[in-house]
Swiss-Prot record:
The modification 4-aspartylphosphate is found at D57. It comes from Salmonella typhimurium (strain LT2 / SGSC1412 / ATCC 700720). HAMAP family: NorR. Required for the expression of anaerobic nitric oxide (NO) reductase, acts as a transcriptional activator for at least the norVW operon. Activation also requires sigma-54. Pfam families: GAF, Sigma54_activat. GO terms for biological process: phosphorelay signal transduction system; positive regulation of DNA-templated transcription. This is Anaerobic nitric oxide reductase transcription regulator NorR. Residues 187-416 form the Sigma-54 factor interaction domain. Pathway: Nitrogen metabolism; nitric oxide reduction. The gene is norR.
């Protein structure tokens, strides 16, 4: 059997029919699997000494979430070094990266494997891998025929990555036009919710707008901030991180703006704050809702005027910093409650983004599980870590109240448990290895953290919120007005007056 002109033309036509890069990639490997009659095919992108799956056919879905390092996968390292078609003999001692990852064949190892490195000029940009359970499956195809397939795939991948680069740079003046792969941000997911989020990140990354990133705890807001920074013109400069929730009030101002020698006890030398460290770069303020009102006012001034004052210094320093902020709170409610400044909220939320909870991301759970399985494999020195079909179903049926962070911990714990009950360096995760509560059902869809209030205006919304706060305080304190005032941190006389104005008492 050999490739005819019609077969090659058919592959080229399928590439042109695709709508978008992902569809073209999928059409390519699906067609190749049919033409070569193999059990599995995959298109991989090469970056930073690792291969990242872009499209698969005949492999377990979690492969799309895995990241295959050269150090951890000798066959892929051989493909990366070869520069030409690589055929692995059926008795090769090198483990196949897809062993145990062909559905229905989890306990069997791949027998035949061909690797095709993909190049753009002299740069390695990816690889095609072809696997079969029959040892002699690929012997009927010549190296020259496989090189033609590699050329078609390399052209499709090179064009896609170049377009991605140009889009991420927004055709910025000064762009060299030389092909440079986009950096991996570990934002794994193909669900509609994640696809939309990635599009919004691409839109805002090339601008210089401040961004407010909302979402539940554990959804990956820091990864969103990294993706925005990496896709921006500021990517050559630092991304500085500060967790506002971990800042004691006594040192918060110094952490943000720095201090001069002698500004306070213990200030034995001048010290730059996070804003100075992030000059010409990006500052990511995590848990922004935890900042005190006093610090919020000082942060607002920096956003308005672009200058800071170190603690203990009267001089102003100019800084050029893009601010990305994240919160798991509903800042609109915080504004109504008087705990967050409305003017700062509007300064930060020029372009709001919402990171969806894991329960709304469908099959992304399996992709992320694959990513964490591969991490565990490398960390523990195992030859393979795979999910059984039952384990995949179990993960998909769980509600994940702790989101991606909970999934990561669950995978790590399951690998340790499975390893303890099985000899050797191969781990197959079963449903029983996951200590997940059966009674935790998927939570209802979360409303956007920027959902508009149903009231007609700000005053009505504020009064309704105050009314509810007072009712709750009274209920929790047996309708004792003095105790309720203490709980609300207000004077009892002021509470009586406010309640009367709101119609809660005569």
């Amino acid at each position: 059997m050999s490739f005819s002109v019609e077969v090659l033309a058919g592959i080229a036509i399928e590439l042109q029919r695709g709508i978008g890069h992902q569809d073209r990639f999928q059409r390519l490997i699906t067609t190749l699997r049919q033409v070569l009659a193999c059990d599995a095919s995959a298109l991989l992108r090469y970056e930073s000494r690792q291969f990242i799956p872009l499209a698969i056919d005949g492999l377990a879905q979690d492969v799309l979430g895995r990241r295959f390092t050269l150090e951890g996968h000798p066959r892929l390292e051989a493909i990366a070094r070869a520069g030409d078609v690589v055929r692995f003999p059926a008795d090769s001692d090198l483990p196949d990266p897809y062993d145990g990852l062909i559905p229905g064949q989890e306990s069997l190892k791949v027998h035949a494997c061909v690797g095709l490195p993909l190049f753009a000029g002299q740069n390695l940009i990816g690889a095609l891998t072809l696997d079969a359970m029959t040892p002699e499956q690929f012997e009927v195809f010549s190296d020259e025929e496989l090189r033609l397939v590699a050329a078609l795939a390399a052209g499709a991948l090179s064009n896609a990555l170049l377009i991605e680069q140009l889009e991420s740079q927004n055709m910025l003046p000064g762009s060299s036009g030389v092909f440079e792969p986009i950096k991996e941000t570990h934002m794994i997911g193909l669900s509609p919710a994640m696809t939309q989020l990635k599009k919004e990140i691409e839109i805002v990354a090339g601008s210089d707008l401040n961004v407010l990133i909302g979402g539940e705890t554990g959804t990956g807001k820091e990864l969103v901030a990294k993706a925005i920074h990496q896709g921006s013109p500021r990517a050559v400069n630092p991304l500085v991180y500060l967790n506002c929730a971990a800042l004691p009030e006594s040192v918060a101002e110094s952490e943000l703006f720095g201090h001069v020698k002698g500004a306070f006890t213990g200030a034995i030398s001048n010290r730059s704050g996070k804003f100075e460290m992030a000059d010409n770069g990006t500052l990511f303020l995590d848990e922004i809702g935890e900042l005190s009102l006093a610090l919020q006012a000082k942060l607002l001034r920096v956003l308005q005027y672009g200058d800071i004052q170190r603690v203990g210094d009267d001089r102003s320093l100019r800084v050029d910093v893009r601010v990305l902020a994240a919160t798991n709170r509903d800042l609109r409610e915080e504004v109504l409650a008087g705990r967050f400044r409305a003017d700062l909220f509007h300064r930060l939320s020029v372009f709001p983004l919402f990171v969806p909870p894991l329960r709304e991301r469908g099959d992304d759970v399996v992709l992320l599980a694959g990513y964490f399985c591969e991490q565990c494999r490398l960390r523990l020195g195992l030859s393979r870590v795979v999910l059984s079909p039952g384990a995949r179903r179990h993960l998909l049926n769980y509600g994940w109240p702790g989101n991606v962070r909970e999934l990561e911990h669950a995978i790590h714990r399951a690998v340790v448990l499975a390893r303890a009950t099985r000899a050797g360096d191969e781990v197959i995760l079963e449903a029983q290895h996951f200590a997940l509560s059966e009674d935790v059902l998927p939570a209802p869809p979360a409303e956007s953290f920027l959902a508009l209030p149903t009231c007609r205006n700000l005053r009505e919304s504020t009064e309704n919120f105050q009314r509810e706060m007072i009712r709750q305080a009274l209920a929790q304190n047996n309708h004792n007005w003095a105790a309720s005032a203490r709980a609300l941190e207000t004077d009892v006389a002021n509470l009586h007056r406010l309640a009367k104005r709101l119609g809660l008492k005569d």
